[in-house]
Amino acid sequence: MAQTLNRSLTDLGALLHLVDPTLPIGGFNHSNGLETFVQQRVVESKATLEEYVQTQLLQNWIYNDGAYLSLAFDAMNEGNFDRLCELDWQLSATKVARESREGSFKLGVRLLKIFIRYETHTLLTAYQQAIAEKRVQGYFPIVFAMVAQAMGLTKADTLYAFYYNAAVGAITNGVKLIPLSQMDGQDILFDLRGSLVQAVELSLDPDEEWLGAATLANDIRAMQHEVLYTRLYMS
């Protein structure tokens, strides 16, 4: 019993570390197009921010970052390094907005730099070498999956943590940009609990035919962000 409890708490600690908002990777610098939505007054209230995050979660992330994370987790389980590289290349092709694309691999490279110091895994080492040799970029969802699998976490827990982290980031940015009260942000996060579980269920075995399915409005806003007159975020 004690051994099982210790393992469970160790896994929980690893998961919390992986999604720690104070990780020095720069995630707080990126809105991924949300700042444009706010400046255009498309997202301007508690209701529209919640609608935005729900749309991102169930119409964008499950076909993009979440799906790639799921497939990368499987590749780690299989020890398939070539597949991990292939997923990195595919993800690069589907991120059409330059700022979002560059932001993702910058976060991934920094995340790997942190956790490779603690997790001994041949594929993590090989992937870091491939990044150094510019054979892959090191996108955030790929690295997140690799690190989580190396920690011994389950895929479902990893997906939930990833989506939760993304949702918290979007809500935090929206609260700051609109602006809204902190309690409004907490209400939105509470309302998302069921949707987060749904997103995990839809991502456990992703249909590769749907990889890269886009919310075009978000991609356009992410590209427009490059030329905003004033901005707080890098993407």
UniProtKB/Swiss-Prot annotation:
Belongs to the UreF family. HAMAP family: UreF (MF_01385). Its main location: cytoplasm. Required for maturation of urease via the functional incorporation of the urease nickel metallocenter. One of its GO terms (molecular function) is nickel cation binding. It comes from Haemophilus influenzae (strain PittEE). UreD, UreF and UreG form a complex that acts as a GTP-hydrolysis-dependent molecular chaperone, activating the urease apoprotein by helping to assemble the nickel containing metallocenter of UreC. The UreE protein probably delivers the nickel. This is Urease accessory protein UreF. It is found in: Cytoplasm. InterPro entries: UreF, UreF_sf. Keywords: Chaperone, Cytoplasm, Nickel insertion. One of its GO terms (cellular component) is cytoplasm.
